[in-house]
Amino acid sequence: MVLRLKLVFPNSLRQRCVIHRCRNVLAKVPVEHQSEVKAAYWAIFDPTGEPPGHKSIAVAAKRAADFSATFGRRFPSAVACLNDDLTSLFSYLCFPAEHHKRIRHSNFIERTFGETRRRVKVIGRLPGERSCLGLLWAVLDRASRGWRGVTMTPATVRQLQELRHQLLDPPTAGDPRGRVDETVTAAA
């Protein structure tokens, strides 16, 4: 599925859930050392103090390298688990800092999937595609009313527009990029 997503959306960023990765890393560590490894793991994802983008990702990558150096000899499988697709753990760092806590994990998506499964289980069998889409719409509509934590100010909208331009139209050598041609409004 990941390969198909890359084919269809080649410029998109894919975020791995940092919570699930933490669980996977800790599963490879003896219980008596898990609190130490867990604290070091979460230190990787502490705020970097850098603006969103490549500098912020570089700081987090340096922290991950320090984690690997610290625990590599004692827990090689845990370090290998962390380093597997590491760049996908840092995708959220390209977005506005106000969004980081909400988009670095997949809990809101999983909750929506769980609610859909629960409702389908109660119904038993859906008579057709239309009823399935109606149920899915109802679940997503209700869930979207409860999603909180992602504030959209004109500044964050501008950051997201700049990120979109970087992903869809990366600058070439000698091409001055630094301004956004679109007008940002409060309604955007």
Task: Indicate where each model-derived feature is located.
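Catalytic center-proximal scaffold of phosphoryl-transfer enzymes
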Residues: M1-A188
